[in-house]
Amino acid sequence: MACINPDGKPTESGTKMLRALKSGLGSPEEIAKEAGLPLFRVRSGLRELTQAGLANQKDEKYELTEKGTELIE
């Protein structure tokens, strides 16, 4: 399941992951728990969100970019 629609906007699961990241850095496990999504979906979704410029990876954790923050406000 994709996290980014063809129009560049996040899907429902993508939005859940972005909202889970809103509070700060999060590991895939923390994001999965907060978003209520399976870990395998979060891992693949984070790759998509990072490639789309909506999230950044720092070591083993992720954070929202300015672009990602704007999409969920």
Briefly describe each language-model feature range.
Residues R19:
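A cross-family signal for key residues in well-ordered alpha-helices
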Residues S23-S27:
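Short capping segments at the starts of secondary-structure elements
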Residues E30-K33:
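A short acidic, leucine-rich amphipathic alpha-helix
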Residues L37-E48:
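Short amphipathic alpha-helical interaction segments
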